[in-house]
């Protein structure tokens, strides 16, 4: 079944708000129905064209390893689809976490854009999932996570695998917030050159080095047609590029999105912020993640193990970066915490 990309001719870029998916990491997956309904209504009214709703780790992510959802994600997807008047509802899935049945259920509940994420060197595991999504008539988006870890030409080869499998837009995903300006530009440009008219290119940034907005501008100038952000930076780590700031900057440089700056600023301040457990901070932990290249969703896991074992969270995160851990390896933070704990005890014993 052929599905066109949802893209208004008046837009230069299509923006996806990920507050209700990436923000789930920051909220420890505790969204209520009232919060989701209010946020979707506000974003929709501001003109946000795509709103992503899922557990932070995608369909099926509610688990002991990733954290349990307060409200089943499928119920939230259905509520979001019923609430939105114009916006399309997207959902994320990671092969090996979500299943084909999860995709079908999400579509039945009103989701129309399937975003499939893999580690940036493992695009081949998404082939069957893209095939199924296209057969179902879903629009498809591919996420190449931790894109900072391989060079542009290698990333472009992985993007080609996704596009050939049926992906309609492949994202450079800066999961760690580790890319700096030229790194984004070069990767996006490489994907644009490789994919041509076969698929669009997108960019998903994090604020761990404070560059979410600047990197998104670089991506657009390099040819990206889809950009992610979250109101109030509501996302993992220091959060995503704030949508309200993105729109302000895009307006200033003449990039059309169809989103009203004042309405989205109101939505961020009056609707999204009250649903956040705290602001997403650019603090030492977040900076260490960006500097060391650590997957942003590790933050809450590291804080939990820090409190459990009495070791500094920033040291946990730095060593996770040294070991080049990727999404799905959060449990290894326990091993690192025990390692640091042993070192502390050995040092204390030697000092006696």
Curated annotation (Swiss-Prot):
Substrate binds at residues 21-22, 175, 204, 295. The record marks 21 as: Transition state stabilizer. InterPro entries: 2-IPM_HCS-like (IPR050073), 4OH_2_O-val_aldolase (IPR017629), Aldolase_TIM (IPR013785), DmpG_comm (IPR012425), DRE_TIM_HOA (IPR035685), PYR_CT (IPR000891). It catalyses: (S)-4-hydroxy-2-oxopentanoate = acetaldehyde + pyruvate. The active site is at 25 (proton acceptor). It is an enzyme of class 4 (lyase). Its EC number is 4.1.3.39. GO terms for molecular function: 2-isopropylmalate synthase activity; 4-hydroxy-2-oxovalerate aldolase activity; manganese ion binding. Keywords: Aromatic hydrocarbons catabolism, Lyase, Manganese, Metal-binding. Mn(2+) binds at residues 22, 204, 206. It comes from the Bacteria. One of its GO terms (biological process) is L-leucine biosynthetic process. The keyword Metal-binding applies. Residues 13-265 form the Pyruvate carboxyltransferase domain. Belongs to the 4-hydroxy-2-oxovalerate aldolase family. This is 4-hydroxy-2-oxovalerate aldolase.
